[in-house]
């Protein structure tokens, strides 16, 4: 579990422990890549990229284990599209036609899932939604990143992906939305943004909490 979230959200880790999980804050001293990151960034609160690297190493070194990336990649967005399908079904039921779709963006799986059916209509010319990704100011991959091939994890063991990225070695400052602290953005969303089919803004987490 990313150390930032491990410390900020103790109830989440305790729920996992209740169901029998061993929960370790990342970066840890239990893996080679974790020790390397701790040495390079003393006192770091980690990132999703760090946790992915440690999980991949742990799976690779233990017989019978496999690691499946849970964000960013296309198959994850496809699975998450149930979010958008249910949203669209609910809106259709009540006769609501949105003109704007807004969602938070970290690695992109939730946003990609939300906008999937709406973006499909937009690409087919059936509707013209304004689609906006809202990312944390502490980790603004779309608004300040570079569109290039990069590793999906800090330890550089996962495959390369073409995406908007701040660099696989980027360690973001802590913020309240630990799940959004990822250095890159889904290749699919990156291409849509690059092609001008969606917008992006970066917002400080304090401003988001005040607005809510």
Q: What kind of feature is each model-predicted range?
A:
Residues 1, 7-10, 104-115, 141-143:
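Short glycine/serine/threonine-rich phosphate/pyrophosphate-binding segments
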Residues 3-5, 102-107, 135, 202-205:
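Active-site nucleophile and cofactor-binding loops and adjacent substrate-binding regions
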Residues 13, 88, 209-212:
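Short glycine-/small-residue-rich flexible loop motifs, especially phosphate/cofactor-binding loops
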Residues 100-132:
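Repeat-solenoid scaffold signature
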């Amino acid at each position: 579990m990313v150390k930032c979230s491990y410390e900020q959200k103790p109830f989440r880790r305790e729920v996992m422990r209740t169901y029998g999980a061993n929960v370790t804050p990342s970066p840890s001293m239990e893996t080679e890549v974790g020790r390397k990151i701790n040495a390079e960034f003393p006192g770091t609160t980690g990132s999703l990229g760090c946790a992915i690297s440690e999980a991949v190493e742990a799976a690779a070194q233990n017989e019978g284990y496999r690691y499946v990336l849970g964000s960013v990649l296309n198959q994850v967005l496809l699975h998450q599209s149930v979010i958008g399908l249910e949203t669209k079904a609910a809106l259709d039921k009540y006769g609501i036609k949105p003109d704007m779709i807004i969602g938070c963006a970290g690695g992109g799986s939730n946003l990609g899932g939300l906008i999937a059916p709406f973006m499909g209509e937009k690409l087919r010319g059936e509707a013209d939604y304004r689609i906006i990704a809202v990312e944390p100011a502490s980790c603004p991959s779309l608004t300040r990143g570079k569109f290039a091939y990069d590793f999906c994890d800090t330890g550089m063991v996962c495959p390369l992906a073409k995406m908007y990225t701040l660099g696989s070695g980027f360690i973001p400052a802590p913020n309240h939305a630990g799940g959004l602290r990822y250095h890159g953005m889904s290749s699919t969303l990156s291409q849509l943004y690059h092609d001008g089919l969606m917008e992006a803004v970066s917002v400080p987490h304090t401003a988001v909490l005040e607005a809510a």
